[in-house]
Every structure is written in C-alpha cells, then in structure tokens.
Amino acid sequence: MVADSDDPDVLALQAALAGEHAAVYAYAAIAGRGDAGSSVVELANEAYAAHRAGRDRLVRTIAARGEAPVPTEPGYALPFALEGPGAARRLARLVEDRCGVLHAAVVAAASGQERALGAQELVECALRGVQWGADATAFPGVKESR
C-alpha cells in the first residue's frame, strides 16, 4: 500500500480501502470456486457486493480529502487453498475479521462522518462474520487480550 499522507485519519482510511480491495478479490475467488446456487456462493456474492460498495465509499471519502486512493493490487495470494465449502467459510471469516480490525482503526483515528463510516463498515463486517460462522464478540474489530 502506498499512501502519500502522514495524516492518521487518511492512513487508516487507506488501510481500510486496501483491505476492501483484498476482500473483493477473496469473495470473487470464493464465489468462483463454489457450486452455483449453493448457500456459500449466495453469501459470497452478497459479501462481494457489500465490500465493493464499501470500497467505493472509501474511494469517495479519500478523494474528497484531496488524496489519491490506494489502487487495488495486481493480484492477491489467498492464505490457503479453497478446497470445499469449509475452506470458503474459513476464508470469509478471516476476511471479515481482518476488515473489521481495519475499520475499527478508522473509528479510532477519524472523527465525524469518517468515523461514522468506519463504524458502519465495522458493524457490517461483524454481522457478515457471524453469517459465516464466526463467534459474536462484545467488541468487534478489537483483539481481546487473554
């Protein structure tokens, strides 16, 4: 990720945007490898659309600040092979968790409408994660220390 700004708000927004780019890729991979009409493919298509919309909101928000939004990478490496619906669900949970952490960072760094955007995206990530089988947590996007 290349960001020209050293503003913490912009850096958090750019990191969240980079995460959304990766999420769009991951959900395209999940949907492309699943059985047409299956619940996994249907959920993946819904999540794909949601992350594209989130990505587009972040692009507009960053551009409105006069910054160049980070572009998508030419490709992404999946963390493991997508062999079956169990692996697809595991990847989806990982995507939502990682994006949730990035949006929580926006909530922490930003204010006003940008903070509200981060909070909205964080909630959506948490809800999608639960749809994919993740446990509900008291503070989504915040890693609990034990």
Give a label for each model feature.
Residues M1-R146:
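All-alpha RGS (Regulator of G-protein Signaling) helical domain and cognate RGS-like helical scaffolds
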